[in-house]
Swiss-Prot record:
The active site is at 142 (acyl-thioester intermediate), 235 (proton acceptor), 237. Keywords: Acyltransferase, Amino-acid biosynthesis, Cytoplasm, Methionine biosynthesis, Transferase. One of its GO terms (biological process) is L-methionine biosynthetic process from homoserine via O-succinyl-L-homoserine and cystathionine. It comes from the Bacteria. The record marks 192 as: Important for substrate specificity. It comes from Streptococcus mutans serotype c (strain ATCC 700610 / UA159). It is found in: Cytoplasm. Belongs to the MetA family. It catalyses: L-homoserine + acetyl-CoA = O-acetyl-L-homoserine + CoA. This is Homoserine O-acetyltransferase. The lineage of its organism: Bacteria, Bacillati, Bacillota, Bacilli, Lactobacillales.
Length: 314
């Protein structure tokens, strides 16, 4: 089934050119089913690229999805046209009375700052609190994962000696988790970050399950047993060129970045980056939509205000 989107959204033409089926509201209304309602809080400066990456993966499911985009009014974007935000994004005030089956909170290039120093931190905390009673499952990505852990469990991020940038091997630790269903024992994923969350803090302060981890990346994917909270420190949503674009951006800014590891053929930055995480990305996002959202969310989303039964893995 397709994603229902505003046909004027720039990502629509890109997805159609890749033979991904999307449709507008007029066509969707004729399908007599309740679509899964997904909210994406896009904190990345590359708004259109991130929209396209996430929608590409969400479209890889047999379910009809209805997607809203959210932005923080306390932050003024320097890289995205105001007209784009006004046309395709909603504010927290617009959606605070709505209910959603799933929420995705993206990463953001603010990880070296203390959380409280981020200009939209208070507004983001409102979203975290609201999501407990208005969203069934929240998928936190990279800095979004670190922010969610800090808000919910007071687990702080720790500065790394060097930036972690490249494609890294991770091991599946919980084979029985629905989120890891269909994965090989090990998988590759992009990572791009200066900070990490420590295993001892997760063990001491939370009851989260460690679904995947790696020797170089440390913790990779965490989740609560009922999958209402999912945390991914990598960037499975990244497309082929994203790390290349980040490397060249930092090079141009005079930051002397290291070449992303395990990314270019023979570490030659003039070569076409090798795509090796597409299957893992498609599997993970499909599992989240199917098992964490569709199989568990109540038909009447208003019931999220109450205690929700968890049907379990098997």
């Amino acid at each position: 089934m397709p994603i229902t989107l505003d046909k004027k959204l720039p990502a629509v033409d890109i997805l159609k050119s890749e033979n991904i089926f999307v449709m507008d509201d007029k066509r969707a209304i004729h399908q007599d089913i309740r679509p899964m309602s997904i909210l994406i809080l896009n904190l990345m400066p590359t708004k259109v690229a991130t929209e396209t990456q996430l929608l590409r993966l969400l479209a890889n499911t047999p379910l009809q999805l209805s997607v809203d985009f959210l932005y923080m009014t306390s932050h003024h974007s320097k890289t995205t046209q105001a007209e784009h935000m006004k046309t395709f994004y909603k504010t927290f005030k617009d959606i605070k009375d709505n209910y959603y089956d799933g929420l995705i909170i993206t990463g953001a290039p603010v990880e070296t700052m203390p959380f409280e120093k981020v200009d939209y931190w208070e507004e983001l905390c409102q979203v975290f609190q609201w999501s407990k009673t208005h969203v069934y499952s929240t998928l936190h990505l990279c800095w979004g994962a670190q922010a969610g852990l800090y808000y919910r469990y007071s687990v702080d991020k720790v500065q790394m000696t060097d930036k972690l940038s490249g494609i890294y091997l991770q091991k599946v630790n919980e084979q029985l988790s629905p989120l890891m269903r269909g994965f090989d024992d090990c998988f590759l994923s992009p990572h791009s970050r200066y900070t990490e969350v420590l295993l001892k803090d997760i063990n001491n302060k939370t009851n989260l399950e460690i679904l995947a981890s790696g020797e170089k990346v440390g913790l990779s994917i965490l989740a609560s047993r009922d999958m209402r909270e999912v945390y991914s420190f990598g960037h499975l949503e990244y497309d082929r060129e994203t790390l290349d674009n980040e490397y060249k951006r930092d090079l141009k800014a005079g930051k002397s970045p290291k070449i992303p590891e395990n990314y270019y053929q023979d570490d030659d930055v003039t070569t076409h980056p090798i795509m090796r995480w597409n299957l893992a990305a498609a599997t993970f996002f499909s599992n989240w939509i199917n098992y964490a959202v569709y199989q568990e969310t109540p038909y009447r989303l208003e019931e999220l205000e109450k205690d929700i039964s968890f049907y379990g893995y098997l």
